[in-house]
Amino acid sequence: MNQDTQSANTQQEKKIAYNFNKLQKRLRRNVGNAIADFNMIEDGDKVMVCLSGGKDSYTLLDILLNLKLSAPIHFDIVAVNLDQKQPGFPEHILPEYLESIGVEYKIVEENTYGIVKEKIPEGKTTCSLCSRLRRGILYRTATELGATKIALGHHRDDMLETLFLNMFYGGKLKSMPPKLISDDGKQIVIRPLAYCKEKDIEKYSQAKQFPIIPCNLCGSQPNLQRQVVKEMLQTWDRQYPGRIETMFSAMQNITLSHLCDPSLFDFKGLKLGQVLDGVEGDIAFDKAEIPNQPLIQDEDEQTTDYGENGMIQFKQVQ
């Protein structure tokens, strides 16, 4: 190998390292901001990270372990995988990986695959039943482990897809919440990747070379409604840079007085002479001002290099 080739290789390695460092910082910052904004993790928490073997849950576990090292509070992490007894599922991969990184873990074995195949006719979508079965098992496991938070690997794109699915097929303006409490009030579920882009997670997963396990039960089913919406959003992202970022921002900037739900805004109670703070009533006859370009740009399109954000404001349990 000549000197020029060695120099070129060195420069390429530096570039790869620089880009990975930038990517990791962005994911750390996004996860840290989500944790702070929604008070996801508190001092003394035991966080049960649900690990499926996919890129999202691997990234979630990796970033949380990374943040734990510098967090101003103490919290514990336990990784949990639900072995659903799918034919050909490589049972050795996750235990080997989790032991290699030294994290506490538990493998829960439940034949949900058999139940789903028995109950759902061939060709029908199994997602709904599979999800309900998993939820019940994970709630039970969290109680057994003494976990105070259950962390799932859903990201920003999942939340947007769910928003559109509910609008298109359910007639609801509803997405995935970044934090929720179970119906019985006993479990709190968090989604620390809520601010993270799927394409960032994909790049990070490839760089870290996580041992990905494909899902043959639900994710491989063709013609799912979610896949159609996903492809629609990906097309928009390619054709209109910044649109996805602006749409997600819209989920955090809601004007109830300009929607149509009387249970959320007292339209009937509006009377002459009232002055309502924070209600944009005076612009009712104005033409909506729609900017030509998205208000928020994709960070990949920006030239600014991002350094470490300020200390994450975890809160303490009283």
Swiss-Prot record:
<feature type="binding site">
    <location>
        <position position="218"/>
    </location>
    <ligand>
        <name>[4Fe-4S] cluster</name>
    </ligand>
</feature>
<keyword id="KW-0547">Nucleotide-binding</keyword>
<keyword id="KW-0067">ATP-binding</keyword>
<comment type="function">
    <text>Catalyzes the ATP-dependent 2-thiolation of cytidine in position 32 of tRNA, to form 2-thiocytidine (s(2)C32). The sulfur atoms are provided by the cysteine/cysteine desulfurase (IscS) system.</text>
</comment>
<protein>
    <recommendedName>
        <fullName>tRNA-cytidine(32) 2-sulfurtransferase</fullName>
        <ecNumber>2.8.1.-</ecNumber>
    </recommendedName>
</protein>
<dbReference type="Pfam" id="PF01171">
    <property type="entry name" value="ATP_bind_3"/>
</dbReference>
<dbReference type="GO" id="GO:0005524">
    <property type="term" value="F:ATP binding"/>
</dbReference>
<dbReference type="InterPro" id="IPR012089">
    <property type="entry name" value="tRNA_Cyd_32_2_STrfase"/>
</dbReference>
<dbReference type="GO" id="GO:0051539">
    <property type="term" value="F:4 iron, 4 sulfur cluster binding"/>
</dbReference>
<keyword id="KW-0963">Cytoplasm</keyword>
<dbReference type="InterPro" id="IPR014729">
    <property type="entry name" value="Rossmann-like_a/b/a_fold"/>
</dbReference>
<dbReference type="GO" id="GO:0000049">
    <property type="term" value="F:tRNA binding"/>
</dbReference>
<dbReference type="GO" id="GO:0016783">
    <property type="term" value="F:sulfurtransferase activity"/>
</dbReference>
<comment type="similarity">
    <text>Belongs to the TtcA family.</text>
</comment>
<comment type="pathway">
    <text>tRNA modification.</text>
</comment>
<feature type="binding site">
    <location>
        <position position="130"/>
    </location>
    <ligand>
        <name>[4Fe-4S] cluster</name>
    </ligand>
</feature>
<dbReference type="GO" id="GO:0005737">
    <property type="term" value="C:cytoplasm"/>
</dbReference>
<keyword id="KW-0808">Transferase</keyword>
<keyword id="KW-0479">Metal-binding</keyword>
<dbReference type="GO" id="GO:0000287">
    <property type="term" value="F:magnesium ion binding"/>
</dbReference>
<dbReference type="GO" id="GO:0034227">
    <property type="term" value="P:tRNA thio-modification"/>
</dbReference>
<dbReference type="InterPro" id="IPR035107">
    <property type="entry name" value="tRNA_thiolation_TtcA_Ctu1"/>
</dbReference>
<comment type="subunit">
    <text>Homodimer.</text>
</comment>
<dbReference type="InterPro" id="IPR011063">
    <property type="entry name" value="TilS/TtcA_N"/>
</dbReference>
<keyword id="KW-0694">RNA-binding</keyword>
<keyword id="KW-0411">Iron-sulfur</keyword>
<keyword id="KW-0820">tRNA-binding</keyword>
<keyword id="KW-0004">4Fe-4S</keyword>
<feature type="binding site">
    <location>
        <position position="127"/>
    </location>
    <ligand>
        <name>[4Fe-4S] cluster</name>
    </ligand>
</feature>
<keyword id="KW-0408">Iron</keyword>
<keyword id="KW-0819">tRNA processing</keyword>
<feature type="short sequence motif" description="PP-loop motif">
    <location>
        <begin position="52"/>
        <end position="57"/>
    </location>
</feature>
<keyword id="KW-0460">Magnesium</keyword>
